[in-house]
From Swiss-Prot:
It comes from Schizosaccharomyces pombe (strain 972 / ATCC 24843). The gene is pin1. InterPro entries: PPIase_dom_sf, PPIase_Pin1, PPIase_PpiC, WW_dom, WW_dom_sf. This is Peptidyl-prolyl cis-trans isomerase pin1. It holds the Pfam family Rotamase. GO terms for biological process: cell division; co-transcriptional mRNA 3'-end processing, cleavage and polyadenylation pathway; positive regulation of transcription initiation by RNA polymerase II.
Amino acid sequence: MSNTGLPKPWIVKISRSRNRPYFFNTETHESLWEPPAATDMAALKKFIANELQESVTPTEASNSPKIRASHLLVKHRESRRPSSWKEEHITRSKEEARKLAEHYEQLLKSGSVSMHDLAMKESDCSSARRGGELGEFGRDEMQKPFEDAAFALKPGEISGVVETSSGFHIIQRHA
């Protein structure tokens, strides 16, 4: 481990859009908002406090309340990026995607499947590998319709279908 407390090959970078640290694997190019497993948290906190304090400047977004949420995304051919880890070229229509998202919403709200399990299998977002977990975020960090829906939920609640330029989402707020 380096003085960052991160296991090799992880490093700390600063997100220009969110003005906060994130964790980057130099071998796999994976990025995480939360520290990877086997991180020495005390060393990481010390590193961030001592080395990165000047790099991260407070912004209105970083001082706003934060929430944690998971989601499941159903993309369609008109989505902002009509591809996913499951399909290189998504061909379903917008209406087909909406109906599929509504079906997933019913499954989640009936309790027959968890967000984690359904997102891992069905979500078109790269967060699927984490069960749809998005980590912590504040205002002005997500697309407005998504953010408004997520912040309106109480912890544990599941949203209806939310449309953004990415596709159709079902969101579950955790905290």
